[in-house]
Amino acid sequence: MNKLKFWVFNTSLFIFILLILYGIGTGQTLDKEGKMDAQALWRYMTIENPYQNYPTWPGKEGFYESTMPPGNILKLYVNDIALETIVNKKSVFSDGALLIKENYTDGRKLFLITVMYKSKGFNPAGHDWYWVKYKPDGEARLEGKVDACIDCHVGVANNDYVFTGSIK
């Protein structure tokens, strides 16, 4: 039995160290000065941890039609932190939640990728969401405390600024 406990402890310690070394968590979006960085976030969600492998918002699998700007046809991916909030109806997304929305034309051509990333302390007045609008090639068109995003989403502030579905 002692060998089993020893093995479990060492295995757990090894996994923990790997998670720290490889930056699993929320630090991938920060630059060297600790500021939010759209290009670091892009690298994280396209190379280090490709968002196309993330689950989709439950009930929104595949393409679906939007009633809100900026796209008519959408695909919405969420990381595990966001999914836990959605499934367990936690009312507020946790630090590190990542929502990635692919926006398509009516002809299903990708034209924009919009991202909401929850970063504790980033913008308390805006529920700490960091907003980014990327072109499909990864160029950040808008980032940070984007007034256009906040002004649109403030209507659902009681749902942590998210239109897609209730998290309560």
Language-model regions, residue ranges each:
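Intrinsically disordered, low-complexity sequence elements enriched in Ser/Thr/Gly/Pro
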Residues: 1-3, 41, 73
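N-terminal Sec-pathway targeting helices
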Residues: 2-13
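Bacterial N-terminal signal peptides
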Residues: 11-21
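Bacterial Sec-dependent signal peptides at the C-terminal "C-region" and cleavage site
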Residues: 19-31
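Sequence context surrounding c-type heme c attachment/ligation sites in exported
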Residues: 28-54, 59-62, 66, 71, ...
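Eukaryotic low-complexity, charged/proline-rich intrinsically disordered regions
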Residues: 71-73, 77
